[in-house]
Regions:
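Gram-negative outer-membrane beta-barrel transporters
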Residues: 578, 597-686, 720, 750
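Acidic/polar loop-and-plug regions of large Gram-negative outer-membrane beta-barrel proteins
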Residues: 256, 260, 273-340, 350-386, ...
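Structural signature of Gram-negative outer-membrane beta-barrels, strongest in the C-terminal barrel
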Residues: 279-281, 386, 405-407, 413-415, ...
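Membrane-embedded beta-barrel scaffold of Gram-negative outer-membrane proteins
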Residues: 336-340, 345-364, 524-526, 551-635, ...
Length: 751
């Protein structure tokens, strides 16, 4: 969970951009090769601004990077589906496939969270929004960037892939810091289950894709000001419109700061971004996007506990040093091109560059002593510098195969990543403070902060997906991806060790196959089998001790049912799955001092989602997930002896989650909502001796449209003021608690 475990999670160098990638992009742009967006927005990108329902009478929409929509032969089963789509089942589900299929036509568990509804509920962070989706639970800590979640029995940035506009930054040192806020979000799509066949290594548990708002030709501006508990102050702006007959724009800015709910808990988030879209003609469009975010999150690493018992008086304490500092700086740039080359042929290209700089300087480990004092250790200073340049090109072919309607996507992706780690390893330094009423002191370490290592990773992948209609009701969807990764790590000399280098290559193939049977135009049954891979740590910061091992592998069986009913005013889904992950690192039972790659972990479960528009302004969204996650073959070294953890629940994995949200537009211009969020019991250690109690949170919101342009809103979170553990670290001896009761008000002006 911590990004500073240098033996497993390193950090790497800054390198020059991949010239081959840049050349490829230049050629692609000259040829008009682009980033395809298909019927109902094939890709998980903001290209879909006005996509038609997947079953829209014989034709679908091609929207290129926010570009002009064009008619395409529809890939859907049966007659047109209702436009009122309560569960988003008939809308694009690009994160689950590059084929431009709706959720009803995709043999996978996908869910779409609408950006407007996210903001209406007061969920200002991506983490808060995503954990209202079925099966997702927060696992966030400053060490992983404050973004980590769990789903389907797996957790962390390596197993749950995060995308922005369909693209991911490769994970370094177990840390992902972007995207974070929801002000500029059009929608968030989630895919539950392995996704290596779509996005490469990682993502065995699932995928989160944050899709930002795209430029529109209709002029609209939104201005928000707000204030809330713990000194919160917020201001945000979003504007879009046309700049001529061919050019449109979008610009957004957001600033959110507060004092925090623990001493010295200040935080500050600023983000700014924009996009320009050029519609050259109805067949060709370009979109240039740029996003920048600066975060200074709360420097809080939790409170110490003994034997899983929390002293309530310590719940709002902060044991970090007085001058602790955490900062993340992220910059993302993307050039999207969409070209309708010929009837039935669409080409898409995305050229992208990402840069992140991160800094931690604090004390992160706390232990209660016999006299009631707190021992602080792990005086850590770490800097990450990561740079990634890449390009993704794919082409979609619509036609017929053996007389049946067929859609094929083929493509390739390239990434060049450099990473530099600077730190004060081995993180010595400690202090003792009273549990209450103490001087937090300042950061002091006997170890100098110096460059430790750099890495250079080159990744290349080719992929293909196909959908063929075997009959009017039955379709077969399949996919294949091959990835090759070349990795090099250079460790700098220190007073205690000489310089060293090593290199490693990985090659892996992922695939999936599935069937969808349409009982009616609004009811589908599906089944699928998928394979995937996970690194034994963060792949681009692989340590020497882990270099002897291969990627972990996994596979999933899934079957499910999806239905829209009542003219689209209701929808529900049901999914059953089993995932098995193999080749985990495990202690050798015969030699506890040696690690071998033989471990196995599995999970199986059931997930249900429902959305209902009941009339009279009442709507309900609900979901529930139940799973059984276990280590099947896993050993740890305890006091020099090998101890089996077979049958134990993996750390920080709740076995049940559920969400409920009720909205009521009870009068013209008035709306009220309330929601429950339930997270079941989990464990803070692999021996399952430190249980983390289940919890239920109650949130509420209300809004009044005072005038045509002005809306006033109220948001309340954790109304019962529940003290709960969001995640744990250090084998369950340190608990990071969730936020207490809070509230806020906003005024939003649209013109």
């Amino acid at each position: 969970m911590k990004r500073h475990h240098h033996s497993v999670f390193p950090r790497a160098p800054r390198t020059a951009p991949c010239r081959a990638c840049a050349s490829a992009v230049a050629i692609a742009s000259l040829l008009g090769l682009p980033r395809v967006a298909l019927a109902d927005d094939a890709l998980p990108s903001k290209s879909t601004t006005d996509a038609a329902p997947a079953g829209a009478a014989g034709s679908a929409k091609l929207a290129g990077s926010g570009g002009a929509a064009q008619a395409l032969p529809a890939i859907s089963v049966g007659a047109a589906r209702a436009a009122a789509d309560a569960g988003n089942l008939s809308k694009p589900a690009g994160t689950g496939s590059r084929l431009g299929l709706s959720s009803l036509d995709t043999p996978a568990s996908v869910e779409t969270l609408d950006g407007e509804r996210i903001r209406e509920r007061g969920d200002t962070s991506v983490l808060d929004a995503v954990t209202r989706a079925a099966g997702f639970a927060a696992n966030a800590a400053p060490g992983n960037g404050g973004t980590s979640v769990s789903v389907r029995g797996f957790s962390g940035p390596e197993s749950i892939t995060t995308l922005y506009d369909g693209t991911r930054m490769l994970v370094g040192a177990g840390t992902v810091t972007f995207p974070v806020d929801t002000w500029s979000v059009e929608r968030i799509e989630v895919l539950r289950g392995p996704a290596s066949v779509l996005y490469g290594e990682g993502g065995l548990g699932g995928v989160i894709n944050v899709v930002p708002k795209a430029p529109r030709r209709e002029r609209e501006t939104s201005l928000l000001v707000g204030a809330g508990s713990y000194g919160q102050k917020r201001v945000a702006l979003d504007t879009t419109g046309a700049l001529g007959p061919m050019l449109s724009y979008r610009f957004h800015v957001n600033d959110d700061r507060q004092n925090g709910w623990v001493p010295r808990g200040e935080s500050h988030l600023s983000s700014v971004g924009g996009a320009l879209k050029l519609d050259v003609n109805p067949s060709l469009s370009f979109t240039l996007d740029y996003d920048f975010a600066r975060q200074k999150p709360m420097a809080y690493f939790g409170v110490p506990v003994i034997d899983g018992v929390l002293d309530p008086a310590m719940a709002r304490q902060n044991y970090n040093v007085g001058d602790a500092s955490i900062a993340y700086y992220d910059r993302w740039a993307r050039l999207n091109t969409t070209w309708r080359a010929a009837p039935g042929i669409t080409v898409r290209n995305q050229f992208y560059g990402m840069l992140t700089d991160r800094h931690w300087r604090d004390s992160e480990s706390y232990a209660l002593q016999g006299d009631g004092s707190v021992l602080r250790s792990d005086y850590i200073e770490i800097r990450h510098h990561e740079r990634q340049v890449g390009d993704r090109l794919d082409t979609t072919f619509d036609g017929h195969l053996l007389g049946r309607q067929n859609r094929l996507v083929v493509g390739a992706e390239f990434n060049d990543v450099s990473f530099v780690d600077t730190s004060n390893t081995p993180f010595d330094g400690q202090s003792v403070v009273p549990a209450f009423g103490f001087d937090p002191g300042s950061f002091s370490s006997p170890d100098a902060t110096v460059p430790v290592f750099r890495t250079h990773t080159r990744q290349a992948g080719v992929f293909a997906e196909d959908r063929i209609e075997l009959s009017d009701r039955l379709s077969w969807i399949s996919g294949l991806r091959y990835d090759y990764i070349d990795y090099q790590r250079d460790t700098f000399a220190t007073p205690s060790s000489p310089a060293s280098s090593f290199s490693k290559t990985f090659a892996h193939t992922s695939w999936r196959t599935g069937l969808v049977f349409s009982l009616t135009p609004d009811i589908s049954l599906y089944g699928q089998y998928t394979t995937g891979t996970d690194g034994v740590g963060s792949l681009i910061t692989l340590s020497k001790s882990s270099s002897a091992f291969n990627l972990s592998t996994g596979d999933q069986w899934e079957a499910g049912f999806k239905q829209a009913f009542a003219g689209g005013r209701g929808a529900w889904t049901l999914a059953f799955y089993q995932i098995v992950k193999r080749n985990l690192l495990s202690v050798d039972p015969q030699n506890p001092g040696q690690t071998i790659q033989v471990g196995k972990q599995s999970s199986r479960g059931v997930e249900w989602t429902g959305a209902f528009r009941l009339g009279h302004g009442i709507s309900i969204d609900a979901n529930a997930a139940f799973l059984r996650a276990r280590y099947d073959d896993f050993n740890e070294s305890v006091d020099g002896a090998s101890v089996s953890r077979a049958g134990k629940v993996p750390i920080n994995i709740p076995q049940q989650t559920a969400n409920l949200w009720l909205d009521w537009a009870f009068a013209p211009g008035w709306r009220a909502g309330a929601g429950l969020r339930y997270v079941g019991r989990s464990y803070g250690d692999t021996a399952n001796t430190v249980p983390l109690a289940s919890y239920t949170l109650l949130d509420a919101s209300a809004s009044w449209r005072a005038t045509k342009d002005l809306t006033l809103s109220l948001y309340l979170h954790n109304l019962t003021n529940r003290v709960y553990v969001e995640t744990s670290q250090n084998s369950g001896s340190e608990w990071l608690l969730g936020a207490p009761r809070s509230g806020g008000v906003t005024a939003t002006l649209k013109f």
